[in-house]
Amino acid sequence: MKSGPGIQAAIDLTAGAAGGTACVLTGQPFDTIKVKMQTFPDLYKGLTDCFLKTYAQVGLRGFYKGTGPALMAYVAENSVLFMCYGFCQQFVRKVAGMDKQAKLSDLQTAAAGSFASAFAALALCPTELVKCRLQTMYEMEMSGKIAKSHNTIWSVVKGILKKDGPLGFYHGLSSTLLQEVPGYFFFFGGYELSRSFFASGRSKDELGPVHLMLSGGVAGICLWLVVFPVDCIKSRIQVLSMYGKQAGFIGTLLSVVRNEGIVALYSGLKATMIRAIPANGALFVAYEYSRKMMMKQLEAY
């Protein structure tokens, strides 16, 4: 069966959803630690301290707070990201005056990923907001910033709708865009350059799961080294806007640097770097293999 644009988009969307699911299931505990340290750096001395205190306060389940929204966030983001990635590759070919079937360079592929991330940000922002608030609910309650409440997905969603209406789900959208667009240039660039390195003259499609895992890990590290300070500001805006009007990106950035120093922008970086290899490796292994499987099934008809 011939693969039309609609069928190809559906395959990319489904494979992206599989990748997003694998990413969350692999890296959620470290993501929780990252968000806690970004939002409340004064409460924790480091990664180990945050881990031990979280376990002592709320047990193992504390590391999986926000897993539901995280699954929704990453499945939504990666579904849209990889679906639009195919369209954006065609856009890059058109701009570069290339044939529709021409192979893109690694840098051109990175540019396509960057364009696709702008669309993914619109799907990511609402679910990321709910996830971050759930992950830091304990700290918000203990610091007296909010009253004790039922910290469930539905209670957070109702709180956002009641306080800010539907647009409240887009607190931190500008920060998300500032993070996603440049970040995914380095994400896809790092992934494709790593695959080219491991392929060593062979086709990239011949790479096995270990090399795909390592390439995904490099992609994640490239992404987070570039955008981590922006992600820190995004987390602050999304969490702290829960109890009052929060300054925008520039205002929050200046406040953090002035009151806590530049180092505060990198609080939680270690947890993110540890998470990057297994989580992003799992993302690309799941994406590549599920996509190959669906393409084979399509060709069999």
From Swiss-Prot:
GO terms for molecular function: antiporter activity; L-arginine transmembrane transporter activity; L-lysine transmembrane transporter activity; L-ornithine transmembrane transporter activity. Signal peptide: none annotated. One of its GO terms (cellular component) is mitochondrion. It is found in: Mitochondrion membrane; Mitochondrion inner membrane. The chain crosses the membrane at residues 5-25, 68-88, 110-130, 168-188, 210-230, 237-257. It catalyses: L-ornithine(out) + L-lysine(in) = L-ornithine(in) + L-lysine(out); L-histidine(in) + L-ornithine(out) + H(+)(in) = L-histidine(out) + L-ornithine(in) + H(+)(out); L-homoarginine(in) + L-ornithine(out) = L-homoarginine(out) + L-ornithine(in); L-citrulline(in) + L-ornithine(out) + H(+)(in) = L-citrulline(out) + L-ornithine(in) + H(+)(out). This is Mitochondrial ornithine transporter 2. The lineage of its organism: Eukaryota, Metazoa, Chordata, Craniata, Vertebrata. The gene is SLC25A2.
